[in-house]
Amino acid sequence: MSFFNRLFQKERPKEIPTMPPWEEIVEMMYDKCLDAFTAEVVRVVYSIDNTMRYVVLRYEQGLYTYQLEAIYKLDEDEWRYALSHNDDALPAMWESIGCAVGKSLFDSEEELLKEMKEEPEYKKYFE
């Protein structure tokens, strides 16, 4: 009879840990998800509070571009769903800000950095 009990016994739902505080999430996300890019990551520049970053990429052709990203914190439902499918899920993710289509390409990293430092977001959050 114990065989049938084990066979039809419902699994207890696993306990979902509480969402970590924002400061811990920011620390946890530092240098995460950089392997998702198809181009080579050359440099990562973080904002003063580490909640945003510019990712500088180099393509095989030798051209450079960059992408601005910010931390997106999952809400409670998203957090529960993520943990129900993956025990190693993070409570946040890096999300691209702005349109990835039509990004400028640069011949050198120096030229790219000069242009990047002129952006309003850079002046507001990175200096």
Question: What does each of the following model-derived ranges do?
Answer:
Residues 78-111:
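A short, exposed loop/beta-hairpin motif centered on an aromatic-Gly-Thr core
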Residues 112-127:
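Low-complexity intrinsically disordered segments
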